[in-house]
Curated annotation (Swiss-Prot):
This is ER membrane protein complex subunit 4. It is found in: Endoplasmic reticulum membrane. One of its GO terms (biological process) is apoptotic process. The gene is EMC4. It comes from Homo sapiens. Belongs to the EMC4 family.
Length: 183
């Protein structure tokens, strides 16, 4: 018997982590037993009955909205380095490729400026919507100014009086150069 009793006692120590649901108390412990001082409570350490509001999620959402609004506002400014590279690669000759590049460089900011009210609606949830709208507007105007500059460097803009009046002679070139040599 002692061997049998020792085995039961050993088994009890070995599986101390197990919850004994059958026994003198009926095995059902609720929230009322929590403060009874029993060592093997059903609740983990640090458990609270009341729900704690999570403010970090609201703060994270607000930060993400601000970040997204700044991404929208800075979008046109991020396109300017690529437009500068395209302007450089297209050259100043009047042909189909540079003309299409200039048209696209001018059309994108014009299209964005025509749809600026829809963009401002996306920025309404931000606390810095006026500054973001101003940055968006300046970025699009800079893109448009780059397109106008490229048109002027290609000679597509009428900048001389001879472009407007038929009786005025166009300006004469003083010299022609090619490949670094004077012709």
């Amino acid at each position: 018997m002692t061997a049998q009793g020792g085995l039961v006692a050993n088994r009890g120590r070995r599986f101390k982590w197990a919850i004994e649901l059958s026994g003198p108390g009926g095995g059902s412990r609720g929230r009322s037993d929590r403060g009874s001082g029993q060592g093997d409570s059903l609740y983990p350490v640090g458990y609270l009955d009341k729900q704690v509001p999570d403010t970090s999620v609201q703060e994270t959402d607000r930060i993400l909205v601000e970040k997204r609004c700044w991404d929208i506002a800075l979008g046109p400014l991020k396109q300017i380095p690529m437009n500068l590279f395209i302007m450089y690669m297209a050259g100043n000759t009047i042909s189909i490729f540079p003309t299409m590049m200039v048209c696209m460089m001018a059309w994108r900011p014009i299209q964005a400026l025509m749809a600026i009210s829809a963009t401002f609606k996306m920025l309404e949830s931000s606390s810095q919507k006026f500054l973001q709208g101003l940055v968006y507007l300046i970025g699009n105007l800079m893109g448009l100014a780059l397109a106008v500059y490229k048109c002027q460097s290609m000679g597509l803009l009428p900048t001389h009086a001879s472009d407007w009046l038929a009786f005025i002679e166009p300006p004469e070139r003083m010299e022609f150069s090619g490949g670094g040599l004077l012709l």
